[in-house]
Amino acid sequence: MTGRILLAALLAAAVGAAHPVRAAATPAHIDALEREVQELEDVRAVKTLQRAYGYYTDRALWSEVADLFADDATIELGADGVYVGRPRILEYLRRLGGGRDGLAYGELHEHLQLQPVVHVDKDGQHAKARWRDVGMLGQYGKSAAWSEGVFENEYVKRNGVWMILSAHLYITFVAPYELGWARLKPTDDPRTQVAKDFPPDRPPTVRYGQFPQVQLVPFHYHNPADARGDKAKAGGDSDAANDPLAAYERRARLLRDHDEIENLQGIYGYYFDKNLWDEVAKLFARHATFEDGQRGVYVGREHIRKALQLFGPQGPRQGQLNNYMQLQPVIHVADDGKTAKARWRSVMQLAQPNTDGQWGEGTYENEYVKEGGAWKISKLHFYVTALADYSQMWNKGPIPMPVASAVLPPDRPPTEIYRSLPGVYLPPFRYAHPVTGQPIDAHAPADTVLGRK
């Protein structure tokens, strides 16, 4: 039984004779709902595919990695050039891994696949996605390094199975752990030795310098704030309480809203990384609020745009690193599909020219609203957990959060007074426990410095 016939049968059984108006679901409704569900499944399949790439790469399972690619696929990592076809991809990756499958004793080769922004084409056979790749690399007793970069990938569905068609990793930096990213120097030839000994099939598609040089990876998507019209494919005005078909449509719409909010916040992070403040500001609703740590609350899109200058001037600059990774979302969309809330984690990698760089980590508690058919941020509140000089790390070098600017004062004071590490403030949970259904009644300790609870 085909998916369409099965869906029609299920809907007919669900609707039944008790709902004569829609007892025979129209072909148009069935087609729309089928496309909606299929696209949602495709997005999840693409995410699973890329995450499998990361897990296999972690353990140097090169045959398994290569099998994720289409026969005519390409891979391009950094400045090494383009390798074409699964056999060439396998040999290239194996050589990068030291000529063997599996890790050597004491080897660390973690490649986290984070912050996806996934779009499936209308044909349902092709997709594009942007991912952040964070590497923790090294050999026990010998070396340790960090790496970070951005994938802009393409995918293809063949015989019902999603595969990687093009993997292109733009490497931001590879840095020895002790030195850190802030003290890296430009290099004339960023190619690996493998690429020199095992030349690619094609030269690099783009040439760029790794950090501290400026790098802006092309976006495969437009700013979602520029979208117009309601995106709900299978939605309608039917009464879900009295119409089972409408209930299916509503469930599909809420799933789509969840994906669009995840894309929105991921896009926010990618724009924020490069100080693209004009694009960041567009992601906010007209009367939104923005609160970062103890800087206070900025109200309205125009004032938020000005406040973003507190993080540096518009656009990327040489020697500046402003990575704000958007991770670990817990998203809840309201039943009406018009508002949503989400909790996120952010890990920060920061640097300014001629500094040691900084580490940071924190939690977002955000709210969203659908405005003009597009999801936008209505409230962004970032709670800083820790901020530290890279050379000192958390145990020795935590530094205080910035406070309200005298040059560009906020519209309101901070909604909560707290200290980052060594303080242990707990941002309140806006959602119930997913198993017990009970609210999380956990409280932060009193701030002994400021006397506020």
Task: Name these PLM-found stretches.
Residues 62-133, 277-348:
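A solvent-exposed, acidic/Ser-Thr-rich amphipathic alpha-helical stretch
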Residues 8-17:
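Bacterial N-terminal signal peptides
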Residues 19-23:
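Sec/Tat signal peptide C-region and signal peptidase I cleavage site
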Residues 24-55, 59, 67, 215-270, ...:
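Short, low-complexity N-terminal intrinsically disordered segments enriched in polar/charged residues
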Residues 30, 185-250, 400-453:
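Intrinsic disorder/low-complexity detector
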Residues 111-113, 146-151, 324-326, 358-364:
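Short, surface-exposed coil-to-beta transition loops
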Residues 126-128, 148-184, 339-341, 361-396:
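Short beta-strand edge/turn micro-motifs at domain boundaries
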Residues 1-7:
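Bacterial N-terminal signal peptides that target proteins for export
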